Regions:
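Beta-lactam-recognizing serine transpeptidase/beta-lactamase-like catalytic domain environment
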Residues: 6, 18-60, 74-171
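N-terminal leader/targeting segments and the immediately adjacent pre-domain N-terminus
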Residues: 1-12
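Active/ligand-binding-proximal structured segments within catalytic/core domains
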Residues: 65-74
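Active-site phosphate-binding and catalytic loops of NTP-dependent enzymes
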Residues: 11-19
């Protein structure tokens, strides 16, 4: 059933223009204990045909991307850097030296969002601001990036570990 769902989703995405997609991987886990319930993978060959690629779940590597956002919020809550329901302004963040960071959903505006909305919209800015608060250096326009971030890094890693990121799977 998982493979069928994966195949349908691939077909849907490709019909919507996702032509560069060359594979799709899926792992279904029990959220209470982490047990793996199903694994599926499909690879799209040069002719556009789907081939089994379950092994890709173990052998392929990808940048974690937005999967870290839940763990970032968890670290923020546990370390009292942010509160549940806290609102922040999603806006382009401008740092010393010309570095600018923004969210994809809101590249130029100033939008107030809370933590739930930050997850729904995958707000990079909310996460950057949370990480800066973890480092004890809340965002101000034109600020330099903090240098002493070892403690904040440990706090963030602990939050990420609690949602299963950065841990050995036992597989």
């Amino acid at each position: 059933k998982v493979e069928s769902l994966l195949e349908k989703q691939i077909s849907k995405l490709r019909s919507q223009g996702a032509k560069d997609m060359d594979n799709a991987l899926m792992v279904v886990q029990n959220p209470k204990n982490g047990d793996i319930l199903a694994i599926a993978g499909k690879q799209i060959d040069k002719q556009g045909k789907l081939k089994d690629y379950d092994i890709g779940n173990f052998t392929a590597q990808y940048t974690v991307g937005s999967s870290v956002k839940g763990g970032t919020l968890l670290a923020g809550y546990q370390n009292k850097a942010i509160n549940v329901g806290e609102t922040m302004v999603d806006e382009p963040l401008k740092f010393q030296g010309g570095l600018t960071k923004r969210s994809y959903f809101n590249k130029n505006g100033h939008v107030s969002i809370d933590d739930k909305q930050a997850l729904m919209h995958s707000s990079n800015v909310y996460m950057f601001k949370t990480a800066l608060k973890l480092a004890g250096d809340p965002y101000t326009s034109g600020m330099s990036l903090p240098n002493n971030i070892a403690d904040a890094g440990r706090k963030l890693r602990k939050g990420l570990n609690q949602v299963g990121l950065g841990l050995k799977t036992g597989i």
